[in-house]
Amino acid sequence: HLHQPVQETATVAATAQPADAPEGALPSEVRPEIVTWEKLCEAIKASGRAYDMDMIEKAYNLANDAHKGVCRRSGEPYICHPLAVARLVLDLGMDSESIAAALLHDVVEDTPTTLDDLTAQFGSEVAQMVDGVTKLTKIQFSNIEELQAENLRKMLLAMSRDVRVMIIKLCDRLHNMRTGDAWPEQKRRDKARET
C-alpha cells in the first residue's frame, strides 16, 4: 500500500548504454539513467524479494522532507542522490534495513534529524548503519596517503561491525563519482584518489 509521495527523480547508473547514447561513447561519458521513487518501487517489486515497503517508504518520506529545497551542484533536488544510492543497494540484493539506511544516509549529517530520531522511527539497526556511514565520511586529512590509510582502517572497522555500512558507503561514493561532472576538476580528482 504505497502512498503517493512527491515524485522526485534520481540518477542511477545504467548497466547498458541508453538508446540515445552517442555511438562509441564510454559508459562514463553517458548520463546515468533517471529513476523516480515509483521506478525504485517497481524495481523492488521486480526483484522478487520480500521487502518491508512501509519502512522503505517511511525512510523515503523522511529523507525527502529533510532534504526539501536543497539541490545538488548539478541543480537536481538533493533527494536524487539518496534515491540513487538506495537503487544501487537494491541492485546488490541487500535487505530492507539497508535500503532504508541508504535513503537516510545523509540525513543526520546534513539536516537537523538526529540518530535518536532515526532510532525512534526505524530502530537501532537502521540508525546504527546511518551512523556508520556518517562516521566513514567525517574525518579530514592533510595528505592523500594518510587519507587512503585512514579510509582503509575505517572500512575494515565498519566491516567488522556490519558489512552493510561499507557497502552503502561504497554505493554513495559510486553515485557521487558517476554524477561528479558538476564538480570542479580538482574536486573530481581528489574524490577519485580518496575513493
Describe each region flagged by the PLM.
Residues H1-T195:
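Active-site helical microenvironments for divalent-metal-assisted chemistry
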